[in-house]
Design a protein with these regions (language model features):
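Metal-dependent polysaccharide deacetylase catalytic core of the NodB/CE4 family, i.e.
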Residues: 37-119
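Active-site-adjacent substrate/metal-binding segments within catalytic domains
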Residues: 18-24
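A short acidic, amphipathic alpha-helical/loop segment
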Residues: 29-33
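N-terminal pre-catalytic segment of deacetylase/amide-hydrolase enzymes
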Residues: 1-18, 72
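Short, conserved clusters of charged catalytic residues that mark active-site
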Residues: 25-26, 66
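Generic hydrophobic alpha-helical membrane-span motif
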Residues: 27-28, 91
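Short, glycine/acidic-enriched loop or turn micro-motifs at the edges of active sites
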Residues: 24-25, 88
Length: 119
């Protein structure tokens, strides 16, 4: 019986995956810290949930999504990967298969339209 040896990029036997959701303002600081230590990861973005330009949040709001123009600037200058998450952040578990597929495919299409390239 043949042995199967799994390897990650660069021939590494192990890998750590970092992934973050939703395109929030805190991602900009996270990118700076991670890149200082040579870390990379994936941001899972919901393109149907971008707030309007000029949005303001109440003091103390923690989950502050970035508007589209800021999101493009923040992620374009990073070495992190952008991934489709679901267009409206719907729970895919309870959706019919065709609706779940539409959530993912529409998100992917929108992210490509705004210049977020797949890597």
């Amino acid at each position: 019986m043949a042995n199967l040896i799994m390897r990650f990029p660069g021939g590494l036997p192990k890998a750590l995956t970092l992934s973050y959701d939703d395109g929030v303002e805190q991602d900009e600081k996270l990118i700076g810290i991670a890149e200082r230590y040579g870390l990379k990861g994936t941001f899972n973005i919901n393109s149907g949930c971008f707030p309007p330009e000029g949005v303001t949040y109440a003091p103390g709001t923690i989950h502050r999504r970035m508007p589209l123009n800021r999101l493009k600037d923040v992620y374009a200058k990073s070495s992190w990967e952008i991934a489709a998450h679901a267009y409206t952040h719907a729970s895919l578990v309870g959706l019919p298969a065709n609706a779940a597929a539409e959530e993912v495919l529409r998100d992917r299409k929108e992210l490509l339209l705004v210049g977020q390239q797949e890597r």
